[in-house]
Curated annotation (Swiss-Prot):
Residues 5-47, 76-119 form the SpoVT-AbrB domain. One of its GO terms (molecular function) is transcription cis-regulatory region binding. Homooctamer. Forms a ring. This is Transcriptional regulator MraZ. InterPro entries: MraZ, MraZ_C, MraZ_dom, MraZ_sf, SpoVT-AbrB_dom, SpoVT-AbrB_sf. NCBIfam families: division/cell wall cluster transcriptional repressor MraZ (TIGR00242). One of its GO terms (biological process) is negative regulation of DNA-templated transcription initiation.
Length: 141
């Protein structure tokens, strides 16, 4: 399970170093894809397969389904985690997420989000309260 917030940096070679607490979870290869609100999402390959299956259940006859799948999956990348826990972020994803040097990793239970620190701070500053969102979500199943 992935929990917590981690402040890290993007090095000159476009790599991030996973914090020690996350390295065991992401051994070998990972999948990085474009997420929502200008972040990237990181999953184990088997978890990415489950994520894909959720989208694959949507009717492909609907234009929004095709568009969403293209936007998320066309730029997804399998990436290796090296023995030092470093991950090379592909240039297209760096551009999609507007990543600069300061990065924030956000645990989302089953996946990790990669945010540019400034964009994440702006997102938090403009977000509604926990209570407001929870109240609105009470009937969602």
């Amino acid at each position: 399970m992935l929990l917590g917030t981690f402040n890290i940096t993007l090095d000159a070679k476009n790599r991030i170093s996973l914090p020690a607490k996350l390295r065991a979870f992401f051994e070998g290869s990972i999948v990085i894809n474009r997420g929502f609100e200008n972040c990237l999402e990181v999953r184990k390959p088997q978890d990415f397969q489950k994520y894909f299956e959720q989208f694959n259940s949507f009717p492909s006859t609907q234009k929004d389904t095709r568009t969403l799948k293209r936007l998320i999956f066309a730029n997804a990348n399998f990436v290796d985690v090296d023995t030092a826990g470093r991950v090379l972020i592909p240039n297209n994803l760096i551009n999609d997420a507007k990543l600069d040097k300061e990065i924030v990793l956000i645990g989302q239970f089953d996946h990790l989000e990669i945010w540019d620190k400034k964009l994440y701070e702006d997102y938090l500053a403009n977000s509604e309260s926990l209570e407001t969102v929870a109240e609105r979500m009470k009937d969602v199943k």
